[in-house]
Amino acid sequence: MAGFSGKKHIVSALMRRYTDRVPVTILIGPYCSRLTKYSVKEILQDAKKSTEAHLAFYDRFAPDSVIIYNDIYLEVEALGCELEFPENDISHPRTVLLDEKSRLARLKVPDPKRDGRIPYFIEVCERVSAQVRKTTALGLGHSGPWNIAMHLR
């Protein structure tokens, strides 16, 4: 299967078609920062630095897919939860957003164009995709409803 790109390996496997090897992907998360001069904190707050770190990971390991998954607290931050950003570890909530049940009714649906770091995450996805989408499958990760509910309390 000469000339088979990582993307073709992933798509073939998902469609249950022949591929000459098992596709490989690695969920590295924010620790791709270690392949650059940036700290985890920097790539969690700067789309250009995060893009550079994800592309450094792609260039070094050539996975069949790149998964952009920086932070499990992205959604709760957009809802108003204040986060702490250690220099070389993932962020975590500084306070509990729903310390009182009555606050639940006051939550607003976040605007992905302006709330929290959702605009940053969209920018990272667009920047990385522009560089690798022709040869590599691209995925992204985010928290689902149960994780979000747990992180709010």
Annotate each PLM feature.
Residues 80-153:
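Active-site-proximal, glycine-rich beta->alpha crossover segments in alpha/beta enzymes
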Residues 1-87, 126-127:
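N-terminal basic, low-complexity leaders that serve as flexible interaction/assembly modules and, when applicable
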